[in-house]
Amino acid sequence: MESPLFELNSALSAASSKSEAMLCSISSKGSWPLPEFDPSQIRLIVYQDCERRGRNVLFDSSAKRKIEDVSVSKLCSDAQVRVFGKCCQLKPGGDSSSSLDSSINSSSSFSDAKEQCPKYQGSRCSSDANMLGEMMFGSVAMSYKGSTLKIHQIRSPPQLMLSKVFTARTGSSIYGSLNTLQDSLEFINQDSNTLKPDHSTIMNGLLGNIVHSNPMDMPGREQNEDRDSGIARSASLSSLLITPFPSPGSSFNKSCASSYQRRWRRSQTTSLENGVFPRWSMDESFNLSDDSSGPSPGIVRKKKIAIGVIFSLSRDEDENNKFNEFFFSHFPLFESHMNKLKSAIEQLCLVLLICLMLVFKAMKMSRRSADASQRSLAYNRIVDALNEFRTTICNLYTMPRIGEPVWLTMMSGTPEKNQLCHRFMKEFTFLMENAAKNQFLPALLTAVLTNHLAWVPTVMPNGQPPIRIFLEKHSSQSVDMLAKTHPYNPLWAQLGDLYGAIGSPVRLAKTVVVGKRHDLVQRLLYFLTYFIRCSELQETHLLENGEDEAIVMPGTVITTTLEKGEVEESEYVLVTMHKNRGNLLPKESEEMRTPNCSCKNCKCPISLAQNIEGVSQQEREDAQNTPKVELETSSDESRTIVPDDGQEDAADGHQPRTCQDTKVESVVCTGSSSPEKRVLAESGLEATANMWRNEDVLEAGSQAISATRSPGIAVEKKPPDKLFCDAFPCSAAEAQTKVTFLIGDSMSPDSDIELRSQAVVEQIARHHSPPTAEEGVSADQNCEAKQTVEDQNRDCGTAEPFPQVASEHQSWNPNAYNAEGMSLFDDNFTDDGSVETRTMDDLPGQAAAELLTHNSNLEFSKKLCTKTSKPPSEFCKFMDSVRQETYKNCFAEQDQREKISIRVPHGDRENAEKKVAPGIDWDIPRNESSDSALGDSESEDAGHELTRPSSNYYGGEQEDWAEEYEIPFPGSKLVEVNSVQPSIANFGRSLLGGYCSSYVPDFVLQGIGSDEKLRHCLVSDLSHAVQHPVLDEPIAEAVCIIADTDKWTVQVASSQRRMIDNKLGKEVLVSSLVSNLLHSTLQLYKHNLSPNFCVMHLEDRLQELYFKSKMLSEYLKGQMRVHVKELGVVLGIESSDLPLLAAVASTHSPYVAQILL
């Protein structure tokens, strides 16, 4: 659904219509789903449970009725209203975090007598009140002073309820009868210091001594510390987060220390292995307070308050699933607003106590009239708080988002990176030319880079060339390893990255772009999504419990199974094996047939599974455009190899050998089915009619054929979902091991042609050069089979004689090839279509065979072995001459090579365990955490070394052949990944708002038309963000960047500063480094350099900021105070750059902030 913004863009001037249309397409391509949710679907119900009076409903929004005119009692006279107004207008001095006028109802004036009249009046409670009360209170004992937060799911009618039960220590029934009003007054009078003539002192005493009288036992939590110093001791994670053992950060000086430490501590504080740690929240200090410090237990009445927020869901199941997904993934935000609602109710209780105390003592009014007046006031205030909650939640759920954030789209591995860079540079140029007034864009970017600090880890050096860093977005090896050893919630890490909460002291930042020009605001939002960074998250589903949990990027990962072999786009080459789970894996295709071998010596079918050997990135790219590959197929235990140690065959002097160190995708059976029931899988080659095997080979369970793949298939003509479709089917009668593939492939088949390079052409030419005399293989060195490939469409039952063994190279007869498939690669083949095929390995005296690797877009044909009418007598005779000792000797030789520790079942009668060394070890880069701001990696150089434990297998004595056989490759448990569409359960996309009709406090980035509401609620929002942080950790400061395109100003509002002179915040000091960054990038683009190069230059300049911050941190190490002029003379750092560099340095050197601020 397109937002009205895009419709308005069409009416703009023709000069910018082209670029605006491009921007419109950028946002609409991955458009965010705009659900519908009505505020009336949110219901609030409040209970109290008192020891003496039991449980009763204080408020139920579904049982209220609005009244137009209410006759106010004479007892609620104007004088009384003035008293109420006078009390409620009082504010605490110094700390704005507990401002009553903002938290209760900042939109109304308490001095206005008319507004004190109730607008709503309660009616009879709803029928489900008792049931909901039982659900909310549950079995929580009255003696428990803490708070409980629960989620309830009601099936009929479909509802979700979020409830919070906490202890109220006021000792009075504020909303009910006034029988305990005197108790509450006595309770307040216990503290003689709070009752002074100064009403502001009264309010301060109540809020400070009651609400925050007993903070949690954590150092530096005092509320009276200097919050204006810029360095709050409560912001130091190292001193606040309790850990049962020393933190690794004490000696961890690497550049990613802050990001690493933050995740490590999160793992410790959320792991049950280390005990249960209390969650951090300011309001918990009120609930967890100690009775010993307060008045005597005889006066304090234990009372529990329960707040329930009920979300009425739609009858549409899809809508319900969407909301459930959003609710549970964004639960920290819901909980934060729930706490804000709870605080409003608590503060209202305190205000009513004070007002009733003064009214009761001054006017001597009756209890009944006081009861009526307090009920009316409380009811209206709760309704106001509920309306604010409803509006916030509905806006959070329904407001438009930016369809394709620049950084996240680059992270997603999209093949259109060139186009994406081109679009980004177009928008960048437009903004530099149209938003340069008053240095608006440099000031805005300075503020963003200073506060949204998640960009810092993305530019940290990792030893890779800049082009690879830019194109592949490497991940942090240390953070990846941490995610496996100390798991944490990736959504929590992503949320912290978005808010920029990785520095020290910890700050939460958000950006609001204000302006009436929709197109300009939209462009600025799109531009900023490149600098406000976070990691991309991808939800994965595992077949079974495993240690590794691969998280890979959307749009680049597919899954396929052995039955259907469906393959989608991916950037990874992974192989996993798992048990047969019919509910997760597709059913077997009817087209897949398992032909039996008709060889006279082969008494049983042969089962083949797959092991894709690791190949380098360059080889995978080369293979995408290579028409011919040689595929080595072997049986269940090993590939047949005969070493060149003089053991020659007496009959024809040939020894069968296969290449062990070739960089090909090899077929290795895992022995999931019994050796008496082997089935040879079908492949794209027409081989002999009968399989050949002698008795010794049959005993050893080994056999091999040397096969080559037809070059006549054009890779671009085959869609990805057809690849491997019929290559390796499973037998329906056998409970065989299932194989899951994540095959490397590009997003679009057409891009395969573009990826072809000169290196690929040279590689093809080298492998297809005509054979020479030196390349001839002697009889005791090599044995090769000449095979004739028939047309793909030929029936699988057609007989074809197996060619005789020759000592020269094989040649292919392409007569039956498809002419269209051959046309693409005519230039790379000889006239007769022949190509040399070498099957030598790297044993002593042998030359390593250079075999091309095939990728997923190189399709297999349909058959590997077919029945024939003419038995392959030559091969059968040849195989009979091979002794079993040769295989054992060959494997002994191969044990000296580079290996992957994968043991393959041998299955021979001596139960001899054999080891296969398949060539090149993998370096598959897995962004295991993928939830750092460090990006994702698609290069083998970025992957870390993984320890691959051996999986032992015993062939002859294995009873349960249906047992799972694990090959512990990275990501082996991954079977399903979400679609390419933007996920609603992703903070990275859901909190980057578009042009909104109203201010949304939770959005990290958003655009609005006017700052009227922003001025109205910004102070309370920032205060709430500090008091109830969504990250569940102490926050020193909350800031908001306000960029006004109408006035061309950029200001930063802070929770530590009040608005002065009607200004929302403090003006931003433009950094000269940022200004130079923007202008140098613009000049490069104007000089017709490629957009990719310009974006790379932008990254280099950002990395320069990081290096300067490292230089600053090293200079400040060990110093107490330093002057700005000294930094300019010694380090060449200008005063305008110091705030930015200090913020960047705080991400890796926390002591910098303590020295400079």
Curated annotation (Swiss-Prot):
The keyword Membrane applies. It comes from the Eukaryota. Keywords: Cytoplasm, Lysosome, Membrane. Residues 92-120, 616-665, 769-796, 904-955 are annotated as: Disordered. One of its GO terms (molecular function) is ATPase inhibitor activity. Residues 475-1083 form the cDENN FNIP1/2-type domain. InterPro entries: DENN_FNIP1/2, FNIP_C_dom, FNIP_fam, FNIP_mid_dom, FNIP_N_dom. Residues 37-467 form the uDENN FNIP1/2-type domain. Residues 1093-1148 form the dDENN FNIP1/2-type domain. Residues 95-111 have a biased composition (Low complexity). The keyword Cytoplasm applies. It is found in: Lysosome membrane; Cytoplasm, Cytosol. GO terms for biological process: negative regulation of lysosome organization; positive regulation of TOR signaling; positive regulation of TORC1 signaling. Pfam families: FNIP_C, FNIP_M, FNIP_N. Its main location: membrane. Residues 651-664, 904-916 have a biased composition (Basic and acidic residues). GO terms for cellular component: cytoplasm; cytosol; lysosomal membrane. PANTHER family: FOLLICULIN-INTERACTING PROTEIN 1, RE13835P. Binding partner of the GTPase-activating protein FLCN: involved in the cellular response to amino acid availability by regulating the non-canonical mTORC1 signaling cascade controlling the MiT/TFE factors TFEB and TFE3. Required to promote FLCN recruitment to lysosomes and interaction with Rag GTPases, leading to activation of the non-canonical mTORC1 signaling. Belongs to the FNIP family. Homodimer and homomultimer. Heterodimer and heteromultimer with FNIP2. Component of the lysosomal folliculin complex (LFC). This is Folliculin-interacting protein 1. It comes from Gallus gallus (Chicken).
